[in-house]
Protein backbone atom coordinates (compact mmCIF):
# COMPACT_ATOMS: atom_id res chain seq x y z
CA UNK A 1 0.00 0.00 0.00
CA UNK A 2 1.29 3.45 -0.84
CA UNK A 3 2.23 5.82 1.95
CA UNK A 4 -0.44 8.33 0.98
CA UNK A 5 -3.09 5.62 1.31
CA UNK A 6 -2.02 5.09 4.89
CA UNK A 7 -1.90 8.79 5.49
CA UNK A 8 -5.43 9.26 4.19
CA UNK A 9 -6.55 7.07 7.08
CA UNK A 10 -4.52 9.17 9.49
CA UNK A 11 -6.22 12.26 8.11
CA UNK A 12 -9.56 10.93 9.26
CA UNK A 13 -8.26 10.81 12.82
CA UNK A 14 -6.28 14.05 12.99
CA UNK A 15 -8.05 16.57 15.17
CA UNK A 16 -9.10 20.03 14.07
CA UNK A 17 -9.45 23.15 16.14
CA UNK A 18 -13.24 22.95 15.90
CA UNK A 19 -13.22 19.64 17.76
CA UNK A 20 -11.97 20.93 21.11
CA UNK A 21 -14.59 19.82 23.62
CA UNK A 22 -13.40 21.15 26.97
CA UNK A 23 -11.77 24.23 28.44
CA UNK A 24 -9.20 24.03 31.25
CA UNK A 25 -7.97 27.17 33.03
CA UNK A 26 -5.12 26.70 35.51
CA UNK A 27 -3.42 29.04 37.95
CA UNK A 28 -0.39 27.16 39.34
CA UNK A 29 2.40 28.09 41.73
CA UNK A 30 5.64 26.16 42.11
CA UNK A 31 7.02 25.95 45.67
CA UNK A 32 10.40 24.25 45.14
CA UNK A 33 11.37 23.89 48.80
CA UNK A 34 8.15 21.95 49.45
CA UNK A 35 8.36 19.93 46.20
CA UNK A 36 4.85 21.24 45.60
CA UNK A 37 2.66 22.82 42.94
CA UNK A 38 -0.48 24.54 44.26
CA UNK A 39 -3.22 24.66 41.66
CA UNK A 40 -6.54 26.41 41.15
CA UNK A 41 -8.28 24.87 38.16
CA UNK A 42 -11.50 25.56 36.32
CA UNK A 43 -12.83 22.86 34.01
CA UNK A 44 -15.66 23.51 31.57
CA UNK A 45 -16.72 19.99 30.65
CA UNK A 46 -18.89 19.73 27.55
CA UNK A 47 -21.17 16.72 27.15
CA UNK A 48 -20.91 15.89 23.45
CA UNK A 49 -22.60 12.51 23.85
CA UNK A 50 -26.27 11.57 23.51
CA UNK A 51 -26.45 10.54 27.17
CA UNK A 52 -27.47 12.46 30.25
CA UNK A 53 -24.55 12.56 32.68
CA UNK A 54 -24.87 12.56 36.45
CA UNK A 55 -21.16 12.35 37.20
CA UNK A 56 -17.77 13.26 35.77
CA UNK A 57 -14.61 11.21 36.20
CA UNK A 58 -11.20 12.81 36.52
CA UNK A 59 -7.72 11.34 36.14
CA UNK A 60 -5.59 12.29 39.13
CA UNK A 61 -2.42 10.56 38.03
CA UNK A 62 -0.24 12.66 40.32
CA UNK A 63 -1.72 10.57 43.14
CA UNK A 64 -0.66 7.28 41.55
CA UNK A 65 2.67 7.55 43.44
CA UNK A 66 0.97 7.88 46.83
CA UNK A 67 1.50 4.37 48.23
CA UNK A 68 3.07 0.96 47.66
CA UNK A 69 -0.28 -0.55 46.66
CA UNK A 70 -1.44 1.70 43.81
CA UNK A 71 -1.72 0.26 40.28
CA UNK A 72 1.45 2.16 39.41
CA UNK A 73 3.33 0.70 42.37
CA UNK A 74 2.20 -2.79 41.38
CA UNK A 75 3.44 -2.12 37.87
CA UNK A 76 6.85 -1.18 39.22
CA UNK A 77 6.93 -4.47 41.13
CA UNK A 78 6.01 -6.46 38.03
CA UNK A 79 8.92 -4.80 36.21
CA UNK A 80 11.29 -5.47 39.12
CA UNK A 81 11.70 -1.77 39.89
CA UNK A 82 12.22 -2.16 43.60
CA UNK A 83 13.46 1.35 44.29
CA UNK A 84 9.92 2.73 44.53
CA UNK A 85 8.98 0.36 47.36
CA UNK A 86 12.06 1.18 49.39
CA UNK A 87 11.80 4.94 48.85
CA UNK A 88 10.80 7.33 51.61
CA UNK A 89 7.18 8.46 51.45
CA UNK A 90 8.19 12.11 50.98
CA UNK A 91 10.04 11.23 47.76
CA UNK A 92 7.14 9.35 46.16
CA UNK A 93 4.69 12.19 45.71
CA UNK A 94 0.91 12.47 45.86
CA UNK A 95 -1.98 14.88 45.41
CA UNK A 96 -4.06 16.62 48.05
CA UNK A 97 -7.54 17.72 46.96
CA UNK A 98 -8.63 20.81 48.89
CA UNK A 99 -12.02 21.35 47.22
CA UNK A 100 -14.14 20.49 44.19
CA UNK A 101 -17.02 22.93 43.67
CA UNK A 102 -19.58 23.87 41.05
CA UNK A 103 -19.65 27.21 39.24
CA UNK A 104 -21.11 29.07 42.24
CA UNK A 105 -18.55 27.47 44.58
CA UNK A 106 -21.00 25.01 46.09
CA UNK A 107 -19.08 21.92 47.28
CA UNK A 108 -19.70 18.75 45.30
CA UNK A 109 -19.54 15.19 46.52
CA UNK A 110 -16.48 13.39 45.21
CA UNK A 111 -14.68 10.16 45.96
CA UNK A 112 -11.77 7.96 44.98
CA UNK A 113 -12.12 4.30 44.17
CA UNK A 114 -9.66 1.54 44.95
CA UNK A 115 -7.52 3.02 42.18
CA UNK A 116 -6.53 6.15 44.07
CA UNK A 117 -5.67 8.07 40.89
CA UNK A 118 -9.29 8.22 39.66
CA UNK A 119 -11.83 10.70 41.05
CA UNK A 120 -15.61 10.46 40.67
CA UNK A 121 -17.45 13.80 40.98
CA UNK A 122 -21.19 13.63 41.59
CA UNK A 123 -22.95 16.51 39.81
CA UNK A 124 -25.67 18.49 41.55
CA UNK A 125 -27.77 18.59 38.39
CA UNK A 126 -28.16 16.63 35.19
CA UNK A 127 -25.70 17.39 32.42
CA UNK A 128 -27.73 17.23 29.22
CA UNK A 129 -26.29 16.47 25.76
CA UNK A 130 -24.63 19.54 24.25
CA UNK A 131 -24.43 21.38 27.57
CA UNK A 132 -21.36 22.22 29.65
CA UNK A 133 -20.73 21.94 33.39
CA UNK A 134 -18.11 23.99 35.22
CA UNK A 135 -15.98 22.52 38.00
CA UNK A 136 -13.80 24.71 40.20
CA UNK A 137 -11.02 22.78 41.92
CA UNK A 138 -8.20 23.54 44.31
CA UNK A 139 -5.47 21.03 45.05
CA UNK A 140 -1.77 20.53 45.74
CA UNK A 141 0.62 18.26 43.88
CA UNK A 142 3.63 16.93 45.79
CA UNK A 143 6.03 15.76 43.12
CA UNK A 144 8.02 12.49 43.17
CA UNK A 145 11.67 11.99 42.34
CA UNK A 146 12.26 11.61 38.62
CA UNK A 147 14.09 8.29 39.01
CA UNK A 148 10.84 6.32 38.83
CA UNK A 149 9.45 7.50 35.48
CA UNK A 150 11.97 10.22 34.41
CA UNK A 151 9.29 12.79 35.32
CA UNK A 152 9.40 14.62 38.63
CA UNK A 153 12.18 16.34 40.58
CA UNK A 154 15.76 15.88 39.39
CA UNK A 155 18.87 15.74 41.56
CA UNK A 156 19.70 19.27 40.43
CA UNK A 157 16.33 20.64 41.57
CA UNK A 158 14.65 20.89 38.17
CA UNK A 159 11.00 19.94 37.71
CA UNK A 160 9.89 17.83 34.74
CA UNK A 161 6.17 17.19 34.84
CA UNK A 162 3.66 15.41 32.65
CA UNK A 163 0.49 14.26 34.44
CA UNK A 164 0.24 17.15 36.88
CA UNK A 165 -3.36 18.41 36.50
CA UNK A 166 -6.82 16.89 36.89
CA UNK A 167 -7.89 15.69 33.44
CA UNK A 168 -11.49 14.81 32.48
CA UNK A 169 -12.05 11.26 31.32
CA UNK A 170 -13.47 10.57 27.87
CA UNK A 171 -17.13 9.54 27.69
CA UNK A 172 -18.29 7.82 24.47
CA UNK A 173 -21.30 5.93 25.77
CA UNK A 174 -19.15 4.66 28.63
CA UNK A 175 -16.36 6.17 30.67
CA UNK A 176 -12.84 5.53 29.40
CA UNK A 177 -11.06 5.79 32.71
CA UNK A 178 -8.02 3.89 33.90
CA UNK A 179 -5.06 4.18 36.21
CA UNK A 180 -1.53 5.33 35.58
CA UNK A 181 0.75 2.35 34.93
CA UNK A 182 3.77 4.23 33.57
CA UNK A 183 2.69 3.70 29.97
CA UNK A 184 2.46 7.37 28.94
CA UNK A 185 -1.10 6.79 27.77
CA UNK A 186 -3.42 9.30 29.42
CA UNK A 187 -6.57 9.70 27.30
CA UNK A 188 -7.88 13.25 26.94
CA UNK A 189 -10.19 14.63 24.29
CA UNK A 190 -8.96 17.76 22.46
CA UNK A 191 -9.05 20.54 25.04
CA UNK A 192 -8.29 24.26 25.13
CA UNK A 193 -5.85 25.32 27.86
CA UNK A 194 -5.14 28.64 29.53
CA UNK A 195 -2.32 28.33 32.07
CA UNK A 196 -0.78 30.89 34.38
CA UNK A 197 2.32 29.48 36.09
CA UNK A 198 4.17 31.24 38.94
CA UNK A 199 7.76 30.17 39.63
CA UNK A 200 10.87 31.61 41.28
CA UNK A 201 12.52 34.03 38.87
CA UNK A 202 15.47 31.72 38.15
CA UNK A 203 13.36 28.97 36.55
CA UNK A 204 12.83 28.68 32.80
CA UNK A 205 9.52 27.15 31.71
CA UNK A 206 9.75 24.88 28.65
CA UNK A 207 6.47 24.08 26.87
CA UNK A 208 5.02 23.61 23.41
CA UNK A 209 2.06 25.83 24.29
CA UNK A 210 1.88 29.37 22.93
CA UNK A 211 3.58 31.96 25.12
CA UNK A 212 1.16 34.80 25.88
CA UNK A 213 3.27 36.76 28.36
CA UNK A 214 6.09 36.48 30.86
CA UNK A 215 6.75 39.01 33.61
CA UNK A 216 8.92 39.03 36.74
CA UNK A 217 7.96 40.92 39.90
CA UNK A 218 9.42 40.55 43.40
CA UNK A 219 11.54 37.61 42.23
CA UNK A 220 8.46 35.72 41.03
CA UNK A 221 8.16 34.92 37.35
CA UNK A 222 4.63 34.59 35.96
CA UNK A 223 4.33 32.82 32.64
CA UNK A 224 1.02 32.74 30.80
CA UNK A 225 0.47 29.99 28.23
CA UNK A 226 -2.32 29.18 25.83
CA UNK A 227 -3.01 26.08 23.79
CA UNK A 228 -5.95 25.07 21.64
CA UNK A 229 -6.97 21.54 20.85
CA UNK A 230 -4.33 19.90 23.06
CA UNK A 231 -4.41 16.37 24.41
CA UNK A 232 -1.51 16.70 26.85
CA UNK A 233 0.55 19.41 28.51
CA UNK A 234 4.13 18.51 29.41
CA UNK A 235 6.25 21.13 31.16
CA UNK A 236 9.85 21.44 32.24
CA UNK A 237 10.87 23.99 34.86
CA UNK A 238 14.64 24.30 34.58
CA UNK A 239 17.18 26.47 36.38
CA UNK A 240 19.55 26.22 33.43
CA UNK A 241 17.82 25.30 30.19
CA UNK A 242 19.75 23.11 27.76
CA UNK A 243 17.06 23.32 25.07
CA UNK A 244 17.99 24.70 21.66
CA UNK A 245 15.41 25.98 19.19
CA UNK A 246 15.60 25.27 15.47
CA UNK A 247 13.46 27.45 13.24
CA UNK A 248 12.11 25.75 10.13
CA UNK A 249 9.67 27.31 7.69
CA UNK A 250 7.00 24.92 9.02
CA UNK A 251 7.37 25.20 12.81
CA UNK A 252 9.77 25.77 15.68
CA UNK A 253 11.47 22.69 17.10
CA UNK A 254 12.90 23.00 20.61
CA UNK A 255 14.99 20.06 21.83
CA UNK A 256 17.74 19.01 24.21
CA UNK A 257 18.35 15.68 22.48
CA UNK A 258 21.72 16.03 20.83
CA UNK A 259 24.72 14.11 19.48
CA UNK A 260 28.24 14.97 20.58
CA UNK A 261 29.72 14.14 17.19
CA UNK A 262 27.22 16.14 15.12
CA UNK A 263 27.66 19.90 14.89
CA UNK A 264 24.66 22.16 15.63
CA UNK A 265 24.32 23.28 11.98
CA UNK A 266 24.13 19.66 10.79
CA UNK A 267 21.64 18.84 13.55
CA UNK A 268 19.49 21.75 12.37
CA UNK A 269 19.62 20.52 8.76
CA UNK A 270 18.60 17.02 9.82
CA UNK A 271 15.65 18.31 11.85
CA UNK A 272 14.57 20.55 8.99
CA UNK A 273 14.59 17.60 6.58
CA UNK A 274 12.53 15.47 8.97
CA UNK A 275 9.96 18.24 9.46
CA UNK A 276 9.58 18.71 5.70
CA UNK A 277 9.29 14.96 5.14
CA UNK A 278 6.49 14.63 7.69
CA UNK A 279 4.80 17.77 6.42
CA UNK A 280 4.79 16.35 2.90
CA UNK A 281 3.43 12.97 3.94
CA UNK A 282 1.20 13.83 6.91
CA UNK A 283 0.23 17.42 6.20
CA UNK A 284 0.78 20.53 8.30
CA UNK A 285 1.46 20.08 11.99
CA UNK A 286 -1.42 21.99 13.62
CA UNK A 287 0.73 23.80 16.19
CA UNK A 288 3.49 26.39 15.85
CA UNK A 289 5.99 24.69 18.13
CA UNK A 290 7.16 21.18 18.98
CA UNK A 291 9.17 20.38 22.11
CA UNK A 292 11.30 17.22 22.08
CA UNK A 293 13.09 16.26 25.27
CA UNK A 294 15.75 13.72 26.10
CA UNK A 295 13.05 12.00 28.17
CA UNK A 296 11.04 11.34 25.00
CA UNK A 297 13.94 9.43 23.50
CA UNK A 298 15.01 7.61 26.67
CA UNK A 299 11.49 6.26 27.13
CA UNK A 300 11.09 5.27 23.48
CA UNK A 301 14.53 4.76 21.90
CA UNK A 302 15.45 3.30 18.53
CA UNK A 303 15.77 -0.39 19.27
CA UNK A 304 19.30 -1.60 18.61
CA UNK A 305 20.99 1.79 18.74
CA UNK A 306 20.26 2.09 22.44
CA UNK A 307 21.86 -1.30 23.18
CA UNK A 308 25.28 -0.48 21.75
CA UNK A 309 28.08 0.83 23.98
CA UNK A 310 29.45 4.21 22.97
CA UNK A 311 32.80 2.81 21.80
CA UNK A 312 31.02 0.72 19.15
CA UNK A 313 29.70 2.89 16.32
CA UNK A 314 28.65 0.69 13.40
CA UNK A 315 26.47 3.46 11.96
CA UNK A 316 27.47 6.89 10.65
CA UNK A 317 26.97 9.58 13.27
CA UNK A 318 24.53 11.54 11.12
CA UNK A 319 22.43 8.40 10.58
CA UNK A 320 22.19 7.73 14.32
CA UNK A 321 21.06 11.26 15.09
CA UNK A 322 18.74 11.34 12.08
CA UNK A 323 16.87 8.16 12.96
CA UNK A 324 16.70 9.08 16.66
CA UNK A 325 15.21 12.48 15.89
CA UNK A 326 12.86 11.02 13.30
CA UNK A 327 11.45 8.65 15.89
CA UNK A 328 10.96 11.42 18.45
CA UNK A 329 9.46 13.91 16.00
CA UNK A 330 7.14 11.44 14.25
CA UNK A 331 5.94 10.04 17.58
CA UNK A 332 5.26 13.51 18.94
CA UNK A 333 3.42 14.48 15.75
CA UNK A 334 1.15 11.41 15.91
CA UNK A 335 0.50 11.57 19.66
CA UNK A 336 -0.45 15.25 19.48
CA UNK A 337 -2.77 14.92 16.48
CA UNK A 338 -4.44 11.50 16.60
CA UNK A 339 -7.43 11.43 18.93
CA UNK A 340 -7.36 7.71 19.75
CA UNK A 341 -7.47 5.77 23.00
CA UNK A 342 -3.76 5.19 23.66
CA UNK A 343 -4.34 2.19 25.91
CA UNK A 344 -6.85 0.31 23.78
CA UNK A 345 -5.79 1.55 20.31
CA UNK A 346 -2.06 1.99 20.94
CA UNK A 347 -1.22 -0.05 17.85
CA UNK A 348 -2.53 2.69 15.53
CA UNK A 349 0.14 5.19 16.46
CA UNK A 350 2.81 2.50 16.71
CA UNK A 351 2.05 1.02 13.30
CA UNK A 352 2.00 4.38 11.55
CA UNK A 353 5.27 5.39 13.14
CA UNK A 354 7.05 2.18 12.10
CA UNK A 355 5.72 2.57 8.56
CA UNK A 356 6.91 6.17 8.39
CA UNK A 357 10.35 5.17 9.68
CA UNK A 358 10.65 2.40 7.10
CA UNK A 359 9.72 4.76 4.27
CA UNK A 360 12.16 7.38 5.56
CA UNK A 361 14.97 4.80 5.60
CA UNK A 362 14.07 3.70 2.07
CA UNK A 363 14.20 7.29 0.88
CA UNK A 364 17.41 8.53 2.50
CA UNK A 365 19.34 5.39 3.49
CA UNK A 366 18.37 2.70 0.96
CA UNK A 367 21.62 0.73 1.37
CA UNK A 368 21.88 0.81 5.15
CA UNK A 369 22.46 -2.62 6.67
CA UNK A 370 21.06 -3.82 9.97
CA UNK A 371 24.61 -4.33 11.27
CA UNK A 372 25.81 -1.03 9.84
CA UNK A 373 29.48 -0.91 8.93
CA UNK A 374 30.04 -4.20 10.75
CA UNK A 375 28.48 -5.92 7.73
CA UNK A 376 31.74 -5.25 5.88
CA UNK A 377 33.81 -7.35 8.29
CA UNK A 378 34.76 -10.69 6.76
CA UNK A 379 34.09 -12.56 10.00
CA UNK A 380 30.43 -11.48 9.90
CA UNK A 381 30.08 -12.34 6.23
CA UNK A 382 29.35 -15.96 7.10
CA UNK A 383 26.24 -14.94 9.04
CA UNK A 384 22.88 -14.26 7.39
CA UNK A 385 22.34 -11.26 9.67
CA UNK A 386 25.12 -9.39 7.87
CA UNK A 387 23.00 -9.38 4.72
CA UNK A 388 19.89 -7.95 6.35
CA UNK A 389 18.80 -4.44 5.42
CA UNK A 390 18.08 -2.02 8.25
CA UNK A 391 14.34 -2.28 7.62
CA UNK A 392 14.50 -6.09 7.85
CA UNK A 393 14.71 -5.75 11.62
CA UNK A 394 10.94 -5.41 11.89
CA UNK A 395 10.07 -8.73 10.27
CA UNK A 396 13.13 -10.34 11.88
CA UNK A 397 12.03 -9.32 15.38
CA UNK A 398 8.44 -10.28 14.68
CA UNK A 399 9.46 -13.79 13.62
CA UNK A 400 11.72 -14.09 16.65
CA UNK A 401 8.80 -13.00 18.83
CA UNK A 402 6.54 -15.64 17.29
CA UNK A 403 9.15 -18.39 17.71
CA UNK A 404 9.50 -17.54 21.39
CA UNK A 405 5.73 -17.51 21.88
CA UNK A 406 5.68 -13.83 22.84
CA UNK A 407 3.06 -12.80 20.30
CA UNK A 408 -0.03 -11.00 21.62
CA UNK A 409 -2.95 -9.56 19.68
CA UNK A 410 -2.72 -5.89 18.79
CA UNK A 411 -6.13 -5.40 20.36
CA UNK A 412 -4.73 -6.42 23.74
CA UNK A 413 -4.85 -3.40 26.09
CA UNK A 414 -1.39 -1.96 26.55
CA UNK A 415 -1.30 -2.65 30.28
CA UNK A 416 -1.71 -6.39 29.59
CA UNK A 417 1.28 -6.57 27.27
CA UNK A 418 4.45 -8.40 28.13
CA UNK A 419 7.30 -5.98 28.76
CA UNK A 420 8.92 -6.88 25.41
CA UNK A 421 5.73 -6.20 23.47
CA UNK A 422 5.01 -3.00 25.38
CA UNK A 423 8.42 -1.56 24.54
CA UNK A 424 9.09 -3.06 21.12
CA UNK A 425 7.05 -5.89 19.70
CA UNK A 426 3.52 -4.54 19.33
CA UNK A 427 4.52 -1.85 16.83
CA UNK A 428 6.12 -4.44 14.53
CA UNK A 429 3.08 -6.65 13.96
Identify the residue ranges that each predicted region occupies:
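Juxtacatalytic substrate-recognition/specificity segment
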Residues: 195, 224, 242-346, 352-360
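Extended, low-hydrophobicity, Ser/Thr/Pro/Gly-biased non-transmembrane segments
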Residues: 80-99, 111-117, 122-124, 135-234
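Coil residues (strongly favoring Ser/Thr
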Residues: 28, 51, 115-118, 250
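Ligand-binding face of N-terminal immunoglobulin V-set domains in extracellular IgSF glycoproteins
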Residues: 38-64, 69, 80
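Bacterial Sec-dependent N-terminal signal peptides
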Residues: 1-23
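Acidic/His/Gly-enriched intrinsically disordered linker/tail segments
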Residues: 350-429
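N-terminal, polar/Ser/Thr-rich
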Residues: 18-38, 48-52, 155
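Surface-exposed loops/turns
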Residues: 33, 129-130
Amino acid sequence: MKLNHYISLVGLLIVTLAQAQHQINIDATLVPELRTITIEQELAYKNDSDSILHEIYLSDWANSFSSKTTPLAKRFSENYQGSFHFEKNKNRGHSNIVSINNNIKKPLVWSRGDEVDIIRVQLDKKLLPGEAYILKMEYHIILPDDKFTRYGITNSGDFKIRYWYLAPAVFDGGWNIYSNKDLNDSYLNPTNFNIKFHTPYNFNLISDLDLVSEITENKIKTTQLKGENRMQVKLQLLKNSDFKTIKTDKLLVSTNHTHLKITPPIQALIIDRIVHYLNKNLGDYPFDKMVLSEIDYKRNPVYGLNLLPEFISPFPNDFEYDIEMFKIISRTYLENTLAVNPREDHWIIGAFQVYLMMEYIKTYYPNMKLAGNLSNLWILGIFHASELEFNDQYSFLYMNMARNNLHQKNTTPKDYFLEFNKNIGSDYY
